C-alpha cells in the first residue's frame, strides 16, 4: 500500500529552491518516470534534485528512516513526500507551490 501523506510544508530556503531527494532502485519504471519529471523541474530552476541509489549507504539510511512501501522514495526538504509512483495531481500541487514562492 502506498503511503499517502499530505505534502509537507516547505521551509524557505535561502536560495528559494527546495531540495528534493529521489531514492531509486535499478530497473524501476516508477523511478525512471519520477526522475524524468523531477529532473525537468530541476532544469527549470524550481527545485534541486539529488538522486540516491537505494543500495548506497545514504540510500539504505533513508530507507531505514522512512520505510517506503515502494520505490522511488521521494523526499521534499528532507521530509517524506511520497513513495511509489508520484501522482500527477500531487506533483502539480507541489509545482504550484514552488512557482508561488
PLM ranges: what are they?
Residues 1-8, 101:
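Secretory/periplasmic and organellar redox-cofactor proteins
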Residues 6-42:
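Local sequence-structure signature of Cys/Sec-based thiol-disulfide redox active-site neighborhoods
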Residues 29-30, 57-58, 89:
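Short alpha-helical
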Residues 32-36, 61, 86:
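Generic recognition of short, well-ordered alpha-helical segments
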Residues 46-59:
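Thiol-based oxidoreductase modules, predominantly thioredoxin-like and allied folds used
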Residues 57-67:
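N-terminal beta-loop-helix "entrance" segment that forms/cooperates
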Residues 65-75:
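Structural micro-motif
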Residues 76-101:
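Non-catalytic, surface beta->alpha helical segment in thiol-disulfide oxidoreductase systems
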Amino acid at each position: 500500500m502506498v503511503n499517502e501523506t499530505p505534502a509537507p510544508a516547505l521551509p524557505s530556503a535561502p536560495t528559494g529552491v527546495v531540495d528534493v531527494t529521489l531514492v531509486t532502485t535499478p530497473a524501476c519504471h516508477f523511478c525512471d518516470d519520477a526522475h524524468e519529471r523531477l529532473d525537468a523541474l530541476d532544469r527549470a530552476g524550481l527545485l534541486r534534485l539529488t538522486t540516491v541509489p537505494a543500495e548506497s549507504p545514504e540510500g539504505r539510511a533513508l530507507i531505514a528512516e522512512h520505510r517506503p512501501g515502494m520505490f522511488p522514495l521521494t523526499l521534499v526538504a528532507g521530509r517524506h513526500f511520497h513513495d511509489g509512483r508520484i501522482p500527477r495531481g500531487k506533483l502539480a500541487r507541489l509545482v504550484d507551490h514552488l512557482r508561488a514562492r
